[in-house]
Swiss-Prot record:
It catalyses: L-glutamate = D-glutamate. InterPro entries: Asp/Glu/hydantoin_racemase, Asp/Glu_race, Asp/Glu_racemase_AS_1, Glu_race. GO terms for molecular function: glutamate racemase activity. This is Glutamate racemase. Pfam families: Asp_Glu_race. Pathway: Cell wall biogenesis; peptidoglycan biosynthesis. The gene is murI. It comes from Clostridium acetobutylicum (strain ATCC 824 / DSM 792 / JCM 1419 / IAM 19013 / LMG 5710 / NBRC 13948 / NRRL B-527 / VKM B-1787 / 2291 / W). Its EC number is 5.1.1.3.
Length: 256
């Protein structure tokens, strides 16, 4: 059996990476995917770097036993904590991470602040500091840590009064006319894009899933393992939380 038919592993601290999986299925319809959410240990964003690194390696080892041909770390926090070490250890497969989509936000050239919504750990990591330094001469970039938001989404709260209240409280210090763009620096956050938009109105909201999947496509091509068959690929969803509710939520968010 050709390696091209082997699945692509997509991992996250919970259900957030489903937003990246969704984009991957759209752009790469003939690929097989295995998604693993580590909801038992979510959220990663309030843990130490070492803890996140260890959890990430544990998940990757599980997927390698299922013969994945490529790995997508669809979690900004895990990317910040472990991507270099993962690439160093698993040199035989492409390893793709995700980072906040600052570049497209800056390229909009809109007046006002670019607000980066992310977990506390992502925003405190050197990797993000370097990314911010690259663009802060062109734009005013504001870090907005969002502790508690991942937990709400993991509980299936992606709309309604509770979510609106959380977001309104987060945005209360900012004037809408003074915001150039929101950058969603966590793969969970695209699932509340509609709720953010209902408060922020015409402010662009950008996430990194499209760029990540384009990079995945380039790497599959480079390694000559891109599946260009005619049969639609299969998707398997796994979660460390052995709970039907979390699997149901995962499928609902995938919304295929």
């Amino acid at each position: 059996m050709s390696v091209k038919n082997n699945p692509i592993g997509v991992i996250d601290s919970g259900v957030g990476g489903i937003s990246v999986l969704k984009e991957a299925v759209k752009q790469l319809p003939y690929e097989n995917f295995i998604y693993y959410g580590d909801s038992k240990n979510a959220p990663y964003g309030i843990k130490s770097v070492d803890e996140v690194r260890n959890l990430t390696f544990n998940v990757v080892e599980k997927l390698l036993k299922l013969n994945i041909k490529a790995l997508v770390v669809a979690c900004n926090t895990a990317t910040s904590a472990a991507i270099d070490e993962l690439r160093e250890k698993y040199k035989n497969i492409p390893v793709i991470g995700i980072e906040p989509a600052l570049k497209p936000a800056v390229e909009l050239k809109r007046r006002g602040k670019i607000i980066i919504m992310a977990t506390p750990m992502t925003l405190s990591e050197v990797k993000f500091k370097n990314l911010m330094e690259k663009y802060e001469k062109d734009s005013e970039i504001v870090k907005l840590p969002c502790p508690g938001l991942v937990e709400l989404i993991e509980d299936g709260i992606v709309e309604g009064e509770k979510m609106q209240e959380y977001l309104r409280n987060k945005f209360k210090d900012y004037e809408k006319d003074d915001i150039a763009a929101f950058v969603l620096g966590c793969t969970h956050y695209p699932f509340v894009k509609k709720e953010i938009a209902s408060i922020a109105r015409d402010v662009p909201i950008i996430d990194g899933s499209q760029g990540t999947v384009m990079q995945l496509k380039r790497k599959l091509d480079k390694y000559d393992i891109l599946n260009i068959g005619s049969e639609k690929g299969k998707i398997k969803i796994m979660n460390s939380l052995k709970d039907d509710k979390i699997l149901d939520l995962s499928h609902r968010l995938l919304d295929l």
